[in-house]
Design a protein with these regions (language model features):
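Residue-level hotspots at or immediately adjacent to binding/recognition sites across diverse folds
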Residues: 18-345
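Secretory targeting and sorting signals
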Residues: 1-17
Length: 345
């Protein structure tokens, strides 16, 4: 289930702004059309990191005018689905997959050299996403192992990792898993709060921990599930209370009603969007400096909300898998065929 989103391949459509007052995506040439980027970390308006298929990691420090291939050596067979940057030089990247395909790499010199800091040795584990609370503390999550989601923890910025006990993790539902679609199935806000998105089971749930992954509570969402291709694919929290969930059915020939939901109580309850995005969405991010504004992206377009997820409207029809905004307001998107873009006003 975790890799199911990789099967969604739709042709890219030209990006175009829908209204003069709205921001728009400005495409940035990454120098490749063969890589699908599902990992993205926005540092600021000038600096961003991308990760994807073929073991690829790219970095720009000039607003996307130029991209440097800083891929770890010997990783061409890996899929880097999540990347978390601390700045222009320090970054941690997650490779997903069964068994030893799930790995974590870290660089402290902008990708000139890399250290493999974790390699999964449990054939039953499949890591999907990771998140950092600060420069030291972070978590990664795996699909259920022996009936419970597995959590990996670091306290030194991703240099070493430890599997946490699963005693505080609720039992997974039959068929439940995470979607490694955009690096946003595990997200955090503040020093200790973290949320995990699921799909594939009878109900699409969001699990919440307020103690950095030691104990968790589960809540149902209105996003449809009941199929390995359906559920919550991405989360975004602007603080520990207010969050957004997006997803649906990744299959291009299937509808995705109720593709978005929101919470105002740290994920204890979720309300469906009154006017959701018109199709499956794989990535979501809040816009800094605009309290109630957020973007959702997917293979068929980008949607904008200005009322904290109650209503969404189409902003762009280009194909993107993931989206991220930096604290300075710099927003980036990336996806199939080497696509990358920066949001412009």
């Amino acid at each position: 289930v975790a890799c199911a989103a990789a099967l969604a391949t739709l042709p890219a459509a030209p990006a175009r702004a829908q209204a003069h007052a709205d921001p728009h995506w400005a495409a940035k040439d990454t120098g490749t059309t063969s890589v699908r980027f599902r990992g993205l970390s926005a540092v600021d308006r000038r600096t961003a990191w991308l990760s994807g298929t073929q073991g690829t990691v790219l970095r720009t420090t000039d607003g996307g005018a130029h991209w440097r291939n800083v891929s770890p050596p010997g990783a061409a067979d890996l899929q880097f689905r999540d990347i978390e940057a601390f700045d222009a030089r320090r970054v941690v990247v997650l490779a997903i997959g069964e068994g030893e395909a799930s790995r974590v790499y870290r660089t402290d010199d902008g990708g000139a050299t890399w250290t493999e800091s974790f390699r999964n040795t449990d054939a039953k584990a499949f890591y999907d996403c990771m998140t950092f609370f600060d420069r030291r503390h972070g978590l990664a999550m795996s699909d259920p192992v022996d009936g419970r989601f597995r959590i990996l923890s670091t306290g030194d910025g991703g240099r070493t990792w430890t599997v946490l006990p699963d005693t505080g993790m609720p039992a997974a539902l039959d068929g439940e898993a995470g979607f490694a679609a955009s690096g946003q199935c595990l997200v955090s806000a503040g020093p200790k709060d973290v949320w995990l998105a699921t799909g594939g089971a009878a109900r699409a749930r969001v699990l919440h921990s307020a103690d950095r992954g030691l104990t968790w509570t589960a809540a149902d969402t209105p996003v449809p599930a009941g199929d390995p291709a359906r559920g919550v694919f991405a989360l975004a929290f602007r603080d520990r209370a207010h969050g957004l969930a997006v997803g649906g059915d990744y299959r291009a020939d299937q509808p995705s009603p109720r593709s978005a939901a929101g919470t105002g109580d740290a994920g204890r309850t979720w309300r469906p969007a009154v006017t959701p995005p018109p199709a499956y969405r794989s990535g979501v991010t809040w816009l800094p400096h605009r309290r109630a504004a957020a973007l959702a992206v997917g293979p068929t377009g980008t949607d904008l909300t200005t009322d904290a997820g109650r209503t969404w409207r189409t902003l762009d029809t280009g194909s993107y898998d993931t989206v991220d905004c930096a604290p300075d307001g710099g927003c980036w998107a990336a996806g199939e065929q080497g696509r990358a873009a920066r949001l412009e006003n």
